[in-house]
Amino acid sequence: MAEAPASPVPLSPLEVELDPEFEPQSRPRSCTWPLQRPELQASPAKPSGETAADSMIPEEDDDEDDEDGGGRASSAMVIGGGVSSTLGSGLLLEDSAMLLAPGGQDLGSGPASAAGALSGGTPTQLQPQQPLPQPQPGAAGGSGQPRKCSSRRNAWGNLSYADLITRAIESSPDKRLTLSQIYEWMVRCVPYFKDKGDSNSSAGWKNSIRHNLSLHSRFMRVQNEGTGKSSWWIINPDGGKSGKAPRRRAVSMDNSNKYTKSRGRAAKKKAALQAAPESADDSPSQLSKWPGSPTSRSSDELDAWTDFRSRTNSNASTVSGRLSPILASTELDDVQDDDGPLSPMLYSSSASLSPSVSKPCTVELPRLTDMAGTMNLNDGLAENLMDDLLDNIALPPSQPSPPGGLMQRGSSFPYTAKSSGLGSPTGSFNSTVFGPSSLNSLRQSPMQTIQENRPATFSSVSHYGNQTLQDLLASDSLSHSDVMMTQSDPLMSQASTAVSAQNARRNVMLRNDPMMSFAAQPTQGSLVNQNLLHHQHQTQGALGGSRALSNSVSNMGLSDSSSLGSAKHQQQSPASQSMQTLSDSLSGSSLYSASANLPVMGHDKFPSDLDLDMFNGSLECDMESIIRSELMDADGLDFNFDSLISTQNVVGLNVGNFTGAKQASSQSWVPG
């Protein structure tokens, strides 16, 4: 230690470490400088264990203090180095004890007293040959009372940031300082910060100042009355504790004073809830106890929540419920195997969508197709009447069940004459409508499917031969059609309000008077109604007072397929022509396409128009005479349904559900 610098200049840490008199083995301290080492405490010739520990531990701290200006501990550090080495431990320990007693522990040594008075920078002669300088410009030594253990807590001494801030605030005349003023005080009064006032070197300690101000309860921020000025920081008269207060989290909703009361109430409530087992079982957190919280797990709240979920899981949201019209199309597959749909809503969709034409109807399609197949309608039969009826039926164009061809595209069910193929694009199409099978095809609307999926068709189930309307009515298809007509309105009303209203009006009119029903139908604007009205007028003229609807139906259903076809052509010729223009405008191709395009009109109107009750009165009609007299006159009617007939799926309304295979079902409704 003789080589140790004897000048009063403080030793740099590097010089102390490189001093050959120091032995590293004697100071095995790593990251434990605040702690006392038992071996140092037990070292001999030490006035007290405390002093011994201090003499050893502060050694490197002395290096820091020489930089920092921490006066008290610097001497102890340097002394500690001497103790560990060849220096006389007795003198060094005594000197260290004197130097480590700043202010409070004045052992009588001038340097120690000076250090306690913030001026303990005078070098101390530890040995005659080694005067160790104790330049302690550190005012930090005087800024706070030394702890029982003289080892420094911080580079500037034992005072914490909170202590320094407290000193700064208390030193002000108003007992309040702004943040910038606190910074200034630190730089001015604490030697350690004197050279650390610039922006680069002050970032760290200024940040610590801010943290201590906000995290310690001893400080309070008071809004500054001046505009644009920073807040005042004062000593909290209530919560200020001497020394460093326990660390707490930044002010937030959880620990802010503003929420302390509410937090206390919440804690009490939580304890009470936990005391009650029924409510506390499922409440891990007090947040779950909030009554409006969906995360609530209390028994009553959980029940309410699950009830809400159960309500949302009603049948309306399930495919099996059959209660949601939105899911009707998806539910049709399930209905195929059933006798009939449980709810008309499934088939209430518009004719364009007409779920009735979809799979649920397909169950009955084979029967209808069989009936249509039984009908041998000549290819030359008028298609106009068929198109009109089909338009009213608004059923998607059905594919021909028999090989004959598509007899009725407008109807949801295929109405094909078993006769030589599709037949003439114009003639065969309409004739099938009025053939016995044509009555079957008249209406296979969602209403029919709703009613047991039986075609509420008006087709006479009778054979191709001329048959009276009575035969047709006697057939099962007619009975089903009657049921459908009677029940179609309420079912359709469920399916669609507009359709139900129209059907109700039509049914009432039809039941009251076929003439009125047909008259009302044109007002409704259905193509089929107009066509039927024209047919009825024609048929009534020929029949002489027989019900127009019954006549038209009888003409269509009872006459020979060929004669019926021509009669249908003729009957529909006036109406079909007028309707053809409308249908052409709608579908751009033909009455049939119009019917396909306007399936809603068809499936609303035609079945209701063809209420079988009307046929009870005048079933006996000379269909041949009527056909010859009136219907045959309209042979010149030119309606091109080639595209519609040739393509079973011509109209977008054509639902793929009605395929020829489905039409090929063995069930036949033809009575004879």
UniProtKB/Swiss-Prot annotation:
Keyword Metal-binding: no
Membrane topology according to the record: Peripheral membrane protein
PTM-bearing positions, type N6-acetyllysine: 241
Reported modifications of this chain: Deacetylation by SIRT1 or SIRT2 stimulates interaction of FOXO3 with SKP2 and facilitates SCF(SKP2)-mediated FOXO3 ubiquitination and proteasomal degradation. Deacetylation by SIRT2 stimulates FOXO3-mediated transcriptional activity in response to oxidative stress. Deacetylated by SIRT3. Deacetylation by SIRT3 stimulates FOXO3-mediated mtDNA transcriptional activity in response to metabolic stress.
PROSITE patterns per UniProt: FORK_HEAD_2 (PS00658), FORK_HEAD_3 (PS50039)
Residue ranges of DNA binding: 156-250
Modification sites for Phosphoserine: 30, 208, 214, 252, 279, 283, 293, 298, 310, 314, 398, 412, 420, 550, 554, 587, 625, 643
GO molecular function, one term: mitochondrial transcription factor activity
One annotated GO biological process: response to starvation
Annotated Polar residues bias: 282-297, 409-441, 548-577
CDD domains xrefs: FH_FOXO3
Chain intervals for the UniProt region annotation (Mediates interaction with CHUK/IKKA and IKBKB/IKKB): 299-672
Disordered: annotated segments: 1-85, 110-152, 230-301, 399-441, 535-583
Biased composition (Acidic residues): 57-68
Coiled coil in keyword set: no
Gene3D superfamilies: 6.10.250.1690, Winged helix-like DNA-binding domain superfamily/Winged helix DNA-binding domain
Listed GO CC annotations: cytoplasm; cytosol; membrane; mitochondrial matrix; mitochondrial outer membrane; nucleoplasm; nucleus; protein-containing complex
InterPro entries cross-referenced by the UniProt entry: Fork_head_dom, FOXO-TAD, FOXO_KIX-bd, TF_fork_head_CS_2, WH-like_DNA-bd_sf, WH_DNA-bd_sf
N6-methyllysine sites (modified residues): 46, 148, 229, 261, 270, 289, 418
Location in the cell: Cytoplasm, Cytosol; Nucleus; Mitochondrion matrix; Mitochondrion outer membrane
Compositionally biased region (Basic residues): 260-271
PANTHER family: FORKHEAD BOX PROTEIN O, FORKHEAD BOX PROTEIN O3-RELATED
Protein name: Forkhead box protein O3
Source organism (scientific name): Mus musculus (Mouse)
